[in-house]
């Protein structure tokens, strides 16, 4: 018999990864109240209704850059799991040092 749990497979099978959501659906997951809460935390009192789409695009590009750098650190270390330190180093590389997570 071949390897694997079922007995009829052809060798080892890697772990199933999450299916990728479409970009439009995932960016719309950042709701207006979530953007409003972020703005409140930053000290904003009133928010124009035109700001939400722009905020989503800016947040998307920022996170894409951070995640790309964090994954680069992870791949260089030959790991499959992105650690908090990978994210800290990615932010530091972009000039946004984050304290409180080691390193």
UniProtKB/Swiss-Prot annotation:
Q: Where is the signal peptide?
A: none
What are this entry's molecular-function GO terms?
Answer: DNA binding; protein heterodimerization activity; structural constituent of chromatin
> Where in the cell is the protein located?
Nucleus; Chromosome
CDD domains recorded: HFD_H4
**Main localisation:** nucleus
Compositionally biased region (Basic residues): 14-23
Q: Which residues bind DNA?
A: 16-21
Compositional bias, Gly residues, is annotated for 1-12
| Residues recorded as bearing N6-acetyllysine in the entry | 5, 8, 12, 16
Gene Ontology terms: cellular component: nucleosome; nucleus
Q: Which Gene3D superfamilies match?
A: Histone, subunit A
Record keywords: DNA-binding included?
yes
Ranges for the region named Disordered are: 1-29
Q: Keywords assigned by UniProt? A: Acetylation, Chromosome, DNA-binding, Nucleosome core, Nucleus
Q: Briefly, what is this protein's role?
A: Core component of nucleosome. Nucleosomes wrap and compact DNA into chromatin, limiting DNA accessibility to the cellular machineries which require DNA as a template. Histones thereby play a central role in transcription regulation, DNA repair, DNA replication and chromosomal stability. DNA accessibility is regulated via a complex set of post-translational modifications of histones, also called histone code, and nucleosome remodeling.
Tell me how this protein assembles. Answer: The nucleosome is a histone octamer containing two molecules each of H2A, H2B, H3 and H4 assembled in one H3-H4 heterotetramer and two H2A-H2B heterodimers. The octamer wraps approximately 147 bp of DNA.
As for family, the record states:
Belongs to the histone H4 family.
Stated name of the protein: Histone H4, major
What is the source species?
Tetrahymena pyriformis
């Amino acid at each position: 018999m071949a390897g694997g749990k079922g007995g009829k497979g052809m060798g080892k099978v890697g772990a199933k990864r999450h299916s990728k959501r479409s970009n439009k659906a995932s960016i719309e997951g950042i709701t207006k109240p979530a953007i409003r809460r972020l703005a409140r935390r930053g000290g904003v009192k009133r928010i124009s209704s035109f700001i939400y789409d722009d905020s989503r695009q800016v947040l998307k590009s920022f996170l894409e850059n951070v995640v790309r750098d964090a994954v680069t650190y992870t791949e260089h270390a030959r790991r499959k799991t992105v650690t908090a330190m990978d994210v800290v180093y990615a932010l530091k590389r972009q000039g946004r040092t984050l304290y409180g997570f080691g390193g």
